[in-house]
Amino acid sequence: SLGGKPDLRPCHPPCHYIPRPKPR
């Protein structure tokens, strides 16, 4: 929490992974 910034925490599921319907 340096510089008043929120601590980075691992997301479950990962933030970069968003389940979405596959394009057809």
Curated annotation (Swiss-Prot):
Alphabetized UniProt keyword annotations: Acetylcholine receptor inhibiting toxin, Disulfide bond, Ion channel impairing toxin, Neurotoxin, Postsynaptic neurotoxin, Secreted, Toxin
Mutagenesis or variant effect for H12A: Very important (34-fold) decrease in lethality; in Waglerin-1
Pfam families hit by this protein: Toxin_33
Tissue: Expressed by the venom gland.
PTM notes: Amidation of the waglerin-1 C-terminus increases the affinity by 2-fold.
Any GO MF annotation of the entry: toxin activity
Annotated phenotype, changing R24A: Slight decrease in lethality; in Waglerin-1
Assigned GO CC terms: extracellular region
Disulfide bridge positions per record: C11-C15
Keyword Disulfide bond listed: yes
Quaternary structure annotation from Swiss-Prot or TrEMBL: Waglerin-1 is monomeric.
Additional facts recorded: Exists in two forms, due to cis-trans isomerization at 13-Pro-Pro-14.
Its job: Waglerin-1 selectively blocks the epsilon subunit of muscle nicotinic acetylcholine receptor (nAChR). Also has effects on rodent ionotropic GABA(A) receptors (GABR), since it potentiates I(GABA) in some neurons and depresses I(GABA) in others. In mice, it elicits tachypnea, ocular proptosis, rapid collapse and spasms, whereas no toxic effects on respiration and blood pressure are observed in rats. Waglerin-3 selectively blocks the epsilon subunit of muscle nicotinic acetylcholine receptor (nAChR). It elicits tachypnea, ocular proptosis, rapid collapse and spasms in mice. It causes death by respiratory failure.
Protein's recorded name: Waglerin-3
Species lineage: Eukaryota, Metazoa, Chordata, Craniata, Vertebrata
